[in-house]
Amino acid sequence: MRKLLSTFIFALMTMVTFAQGEHMTFKGIPLQGPLNTFIQKLKDKGFTHMEQTKDGALLKGKFATYNDCLVFVYTEKSNVSSVVVLFPEQETWNAITNRYYTLKEMLTEKYGMPETIERFSDEEPISDFLRFYALLKDECIYKSEFKTKNGSIVLTMKKVDYRTASVIIKYNDNINEEESRKTMMDDL
């Protein structure tokens, strides 16, 4: 009995350790390792590498059936830490909310119910034109956060410039965030 209990506890500890060691993925690629390796894997999936800086890289390609998405891959200490997808810009409330709610529905189906905030700073405007104008003035927030065992996915709508806005998805990795937090705590 004791041997069986010991074996069970060992197996459970191994599973917990393994689960904690998994990184969040983007298009099936774990958010870890050197930037150049991650870029190559995205290029293998059809993305075009556009630019690289000390903080990450910019790629362009098809994501979730939408063409011309911009993908920002961020690094910390030369390792991939998070990914942000900027969908093509929209110029109307109807267009951007259709995209937001379509993606929210798909993410909900895959990851479960999100924590959601969808509201205007003041009273909701009476027309779609004024709703879009409120978005461009940062007077509303549409944000859904999906939490998983390996990280989170944040879906939002944000102003791009004075006349356009975009739906954005950010993939965050728990392991990378914890390592970053640990580094910050060491500095303090």
Locate predicted features:
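Small/flexible residues
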Residues: L4-L5, K45, K62, T183
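Sec-dependent N-terminal signal peptides
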Residues: L4-T17
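Sterically constrained small-residue positions within well-ordered secondary structures
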Residues: F10, F63-A64, Y74-E76, L135-K137, ...
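Non-cytosolic coordination micro-motifs
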Residues: Q20-K54, P88-L188
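Mid-chain, structured segments of secreted extracytoplasmic proteins
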Residues: G61-M106
